[in-house]
């Protein structure tokens, strides 16, 4: 394993140049193997987990979901506030910011972005909860691609460009995650579900953050500074891939759902009656995805 890690380090050094010495010795950053192993295990669980749960009752996970989503909401809020204040203190340039031009504020940004990297490991739990609750329809290509890639990308970011122009996407994403995980946390509480009408606007916000990130990253290409251009080109390409996948998700989830509901409504009127609707919601996920409710385990 040490030989493998040394070979990887040599390859990365030849490909990307020397690492940023400010993160030497930081947890999970010294070598790539732990991040790679976590990613492989994640993909194995995504593959094998639904097979294991196929003949088993889904878990409720309600209590732990409330705590989990509250924790990620607070962590995202902390990261957003720290990044905003760090950028202000370092007088960061919106158009392009090098990795060694912000003074003491750079170290503040680096510390917060390490938490951002680590949060991507924590967010693997999103998928594991889907598996335990047998919400396999939510384990999409977009979901797995986004979760698996972000952890790996941010390992490289933290080792080579841990501050400077790297701050912008993480700041926007932290803000979106405050909204997203607060929504998920509230949706775990049955009495709150009738008031959660703003789910699709979170997806719109995610698409907006990708567009804004491309615009801000492009500024660094048009008006370059000491921040490496290769990282900026990669960021733009990655954002385009996410926009493509998220746009497809939005169309599949909301536009087609609206067309389907209108057709059902027209069909009911043509038959001379309107379908009756239950006076209560038995399962939030069933309502959202038109899935028959399943009996859940209490553990």
UniProtKB/Swiss-Prot annotation:
The chain crosses the membrane at residues 26-46, 64-84, 112-132, 139-158, 168-187, 205-225, 226-246. Its main location: endoplasmic reticulum. One of its GO terms (molecular function) is fatty acid elongase activity. Keywords: Acetylation, Cell projection, Endoplasmic reticulum, Fatty acid biosynthesis, Fatty acid metabolism, Lipid biosynthesis, Lipid metabolism, Membrane, Phosphoprotein, Transferase, Transmembrane, Transmembrane helix. One of its GO terms (cellular component) is dendrite. Belongs to the ELO family. ELOVL5 subfamily. Catalyzes the first and rate-limiting reaction of the four reactions that constitute the long-chain fatty acids elongation cycle. This endoplasmic reticulum-bound enzymatic process allows the addition of 2 carbons to the chain of long- and very long-chain fatty acids (VLCFAs) per cycle. Condensing enzyme that acts specifically toward polyunsaturated acyl-CoA with the higher activity toward C18:3(n-6) acyl-CoA. This is Very long chain fatty acid elongase 5.
């Amino acid at each position: 394993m040490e030989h493998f890690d040394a070979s990887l380090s040599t390859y990365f050094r030849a490909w990307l140049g020397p690492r940023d010495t400010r993160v030497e010795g930081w947890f999970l950053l010294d070598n790539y193997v732990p991040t790679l192993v976590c990613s492989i295990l994640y993909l194995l669980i995504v593959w094998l987990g639904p097979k294991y749960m196929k003949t088993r009752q889904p878990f409720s996970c309600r209590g732990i979901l409330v705590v989990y989503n509250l924790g990620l909401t607070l962590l995202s809020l902390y990261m957003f506030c720290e990044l905003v204040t760090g950028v202000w203190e370092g007088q960061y340039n919106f158009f392009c910011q090098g990795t060694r031009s912000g003074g003491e504020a750079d170290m503040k940004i680096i510390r917060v972005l390490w938490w951002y990297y680590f949060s991507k490991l924590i967010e693997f739990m999103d998928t594991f909860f889907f598996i335990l609750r047998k919400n396999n329809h939510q384990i999409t290509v977009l979901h797995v691609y986004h979760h698996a890639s972000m952890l790996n990308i941010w390992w490289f970011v933290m080792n080579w460009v841990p501050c400077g122009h790297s701050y912008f996407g993480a700041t926007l994403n932290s803000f979106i995650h405050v909204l997203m995980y607060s929504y998920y946390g509230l949706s775990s509480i049955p009495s709150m579900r009738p008031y959660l009408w703003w789910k699709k606007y979170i997806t719109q916000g995610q698409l907006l953050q990708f567009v804004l990130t491309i615009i801000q990253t492009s500024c660094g290409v048009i008006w370059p500074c000491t921040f490496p251009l290769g990282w900026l080109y990669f960021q733009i390409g990655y954002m385009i891939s996410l926009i493509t996948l998220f746009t497809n998700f939005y169309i599949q989830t909301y536009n087609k759902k609206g067309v389907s509901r209108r057709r059902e409504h027209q069909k009911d009127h043509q038959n001379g009656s309107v379908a009756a609707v239950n006076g209560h919601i038995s399962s939030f996920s069933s309502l959202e995805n038109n899935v028959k409710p399943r009996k859940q385990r209490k553990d």
